[in-house]
Amino acid sequence: MKKQSLFFVPGIILIGVSLRTPFTVLPIILGDISQGLGVEVSSLGVLTSLPLLMFTLFSLFSTRLAQKIGLEHLFTYSLFFLTIGSLIRLINLPLLYLGTLMVGASIAVINVLLPSLIQANQPKKIGFLTTLYVTSMGIATALASYLAVPITQASSWKGLIILLTLLCLATFLVWLPNHRYNHRLAPQTKQKSKTKVMHNKQVWAVIVFAGFQSLLFYTAMTWLPT
């Protein structure tokens, strides 16, 4: 195990906090965004689907990127990309769409590689650190959903996006000291391991369960607020 920064655990916690909040609050304030931009709410509905599309696309080659760039370096670039994507959503409607795509792509890469990052840095604390970031993600998502409307009413939808961008920026800055402690993923054996996984019933059970869990979560986040 290589040396690691003292900011690794705080970085993991803040990554958990930033892993859902930049886009899960959007359905709650779609009405305010439509009024602010002078467009129909229906034209903004795709904002809730764009991150999920990015999840699908960028999950496919996140591992290859980590093998070439390294985990810590890739997380640094992804968090920077996440912050910029969140920021440009404030400018106009086209950049709102582009920024949402950037947010989704960044989170997709982080989401896929976070377990590998923990394993590379703290192989003896995988369970603890996984619980830590999942818990921080759940609490942050709940708080963001609860506070989104009061914050928007007290300022505007842009005020809420600014706060979320500052959260992303704080995560990036706290993570930055970890950039120098870079781990590269080892190349995986292709054909045999893939065949075994695809014929494993337990793997398919987990895939189906996770798929339905995500379906219920994102459906609720999209439709219940409105």
Spans of model-derived segments:
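Conserved MFS/SLC helix-loop-helix module at the cytosolic interface between two early adjacent transmembrane helices
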Residues: 57-93
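Residue-level signature of mid-helix packing/kink "hotspots" within the transmembrane helices
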Residues: 24, 51-60, 141-142
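Juxtamembrane intracellular "pre-TM" segments in multi-pass secondary transporters
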Residues: 1-2, 180-207
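Helix-loop-helix hairpin linking two adjacent transmembrane segments in secondary transporters
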Residues: 124-125, 131-180
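Extracytoplasmic gate region of multi-pass secondary transporters
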Residues: 26-27, 202-226
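Cytoplasmic helix-loop-helix junction between adjacent transmembrane helices
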Residues: 101-135
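Short hydrophobic/alpha-helical segments at membrane-entry points of transmembrane helices
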Residues: 94-100, 206
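Extracytoplasmic
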Residues: 7-41, 59-62, 220-225
